[in-house]
């Protein structure tokens, strides 16, 4: 089977930074999964004794706590500080940016609108820095909001720029004063553009990444638009040889939290089909 990779894929700057931080802080715990890739989380625990705490109470039992790439809520951060925990901040700088924007705009009296998934830890963290905050998943939800005169818009870092642009355009037409902040990560945009391009060419697409990863699911969604035979897998063990019957070119991309060692194993298995 012939394999072709997307021009941009895999580990982004924020994830690489977080992995380095975790590897330098053995015996610490992360408050929530450091990244959305269970295999890499297992590697960090096995090789560096970096454990995973899923609750604030659990994290407080450790002397050192690593803040996940997606960030945590303002209240949770304050609790850790008051507990005199050694806090190691691995929040992606691209996530810190909308946190700061939301806090500043709220202080200036703006209603905050976040384009994102309300259950995602990044969005929960960003929203915690504002007072009057509405979270919308799509443009239809915006149409049903009661809007104030002054509104500021930010986005979850992994959303599709095209959808954000449409929301921004509608919002401008609805309010007297609107501040728009494009907080979508540049790596997200580049990876999405690359998978869009490759999926138009490939007979089959394999997207490698955590199934709980927002950016990976976005890549899968885009690939599926142009290549109906698209599959989202976490590692090589999920590959089904029957997918490739009658196919000539397999396109591969990977989410921002997918390490190279997993991608290489996937490539090797597909090339042997």
From Swiss-Prot:
Per UniProt, the enzyme's principal EC class comes to oxidoreductase
Which positions in this protein are listed as binding [4Fe-4S] cluster?
12, 92, 185
> Catalytic center at which residues?
122
The Gene Ontology terms for molecular function here are: 4 iron, 4 sulfur cluster binding; 4-hydroxy-3-methylbut-2-enyl diphosphate reductase activity; metal ion binding
The Swiss-Prot or TrEMBL record lists the needed cofactor(s) as: [4Fe-4S] cluster
Q: Give residues annotated as binding isopentenyl diphosphate.
A: 36, 70, 120, 213-215, 257
| Family, per entry | Belongs to the IspH family.
Read off the NCBIfam families from this record: ispH_lytB, PRK01045.1-1
State what protein this is by name. Answer: 4-hydroxy-3-methylbut-2-enyl diphosphate reductase
Organism placement in taxonomy: Bacteria, Pseudomonadati, Campylobacterota, Epsilonproteobacteria, Campylobacterales
